[in-house]
């Protein structure tokens, strides 16, 4: 464990900044923004206008790798209908 910490500490500061930026951007692209896209789609799917629906398709296309990564945990099934008897 000490050798890993020593190896990281011996790297130049520019390299560490770039590594942290890559890690942060990848987390943002693969987990955080697709989570927000999911909640946005879930709340607006049945009431969206045609322009908003096109925007939703764009978001789904652009963040597809992250949505695919989150897909085992997401529920895209329609809501249960109320049937009046």
Curated annotation (Swiss-Prot):
GO cellular component terms, alphabetically, are: plasma membrane-derived thylakoid membrane
Q: Does the keyword Transcription apply?
A: no
Which InterPro entries does the UniProt entry name for this protein? NADH-quinone_OxRdatse_su_L
GO MF terms, alphabetically ordered: oxidoreductase activity, acting on NAD(P)H, quinone or similar compound as acceptor; quinone binding
Q: Where exactly are the transmembrane stretches of this chain?
A: 17-37, 54-74
Q: Tell me where it mainly resides.
A: membrane
| Keywords assigned by UniProt, alphabetized | Membrane, NAD, NADP, Plastoquinone, Quinone, Thylakoid, Translocase, Transmembrane, Transmembrane helix, Transport
- Which top-rank group of organisms is this from? Bacteria
Q: Where in the cell is it found?
A: Cellular thylakoid membrane
Q: Could you tell me what reaction this enzyme catalyses?
A: a plastoquinone + NADH + (n+1) H(+)(in) = a plastoquinol + NAD(+) + n H(+)(out); a plastoquinone + NADPH + (n+1) H(+)(in) = a plastoquinol + NADP(+) + n H(+)(out)
According to its UniProt record, the EC number is: 7.1.1.-
What task does this protein carry out? NDH-1 shuttles electrons from an unknown electron donor, via FMN and iron-sulfur (Fe-S) centers, to quinones in the respiratory and/or the photosynthetic chain. The immediate electron acceptor for the enzyme in this species is believed to be plastoquinone. Couples the redox reaction to proton translocation, and thus conserves the redox energy in a proton gradient. Cyanobacterial NDH-1 also plays a role in inorganic carbon-concentration.
* Protein family: Belongs to the complex I NdhL subunit family.
- Describe, as the record does, how this protein assembles with itself and its partners: NDH-1 can be composed of about 15 different subunits; different subcomplexes with different compositions have been identified which probably have different functions.
- The entry's protein name is NAD(P)H-quinone oxidoreductase subunit L
Gene source species: Crocosphaera subtropica (strain ATCC 51142 / BH68)
| Lineage of the species this protein comes from | Bacteria, Bacillati, Cyanobacteriota, Cyanophyceae, Oscillatoriophycideae
């Amino acid at each position: 464990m000490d050798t890993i910490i020593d190896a990281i500490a011996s790297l130049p500061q520019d390299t560490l900044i770039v590594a942290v930026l890559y890690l942060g951007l990848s987390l943002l692209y693969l987990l955080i923004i697709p989570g927000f896209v999911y909640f946005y789609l879930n709340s607006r799917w049945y009431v969206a206008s045609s322009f908003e629906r096109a925007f939703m398709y764009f978001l789904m296309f652009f963040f597809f790798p992250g949505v695919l990564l989150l897909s085992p945990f997401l529920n895209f099934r329609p809501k249960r209908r109320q049937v009046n008897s």
